[in-house]
Each structure stands twice: as C-alpha cells, then as structure tokens.
C-alpha cells in the first residue's frame, strides 16, 4: 500500500489512522482505500 508522503509507514502498523494529522489521514484513507 502507498506510504504517506510526509512520514514512512511503520512496518506491522496497518492502521496509522489517528496517529496521522486529519488531512493526511483523509488522504491516506482515500489512497489506501481504507
């Protein structure tokens, strides 16, 4: 799955939502399809 542009994806962490800022969380949800 795509990584966040400003922050690398933590291995084993499939749900970074909540740790990300609301804007990035929304973008990640759309890109990732979560």
UniProtKB/Swiss-Prot annotation:
Protein localization: Secreted
Keywords carried by this UniProt record: Heme, Iron, Metal-binding, Repeat, Secreted, Transport
GO annotations of cellular component type: extracellular region
Tissues/organs with expression: Expressed by the liver and secreted in plasma.
GO molecular function, one term: metal ion binding
Chain positions covered by the region annotation Disordered: 1-25
Function: Binds heme and transports it to the liver for breakdown and iron recovery, after which the free hemopexin returns to the circulation.
Similarity section: Belongs to the hemopexin family.
The protein's name in its UniProt record: Hemopexin
Organism listed in the record: Gallus gallus (Chicken)
Upper classification of the organism: Eukaryota, Metazoa, Chordata, Craniata, Vertebrata
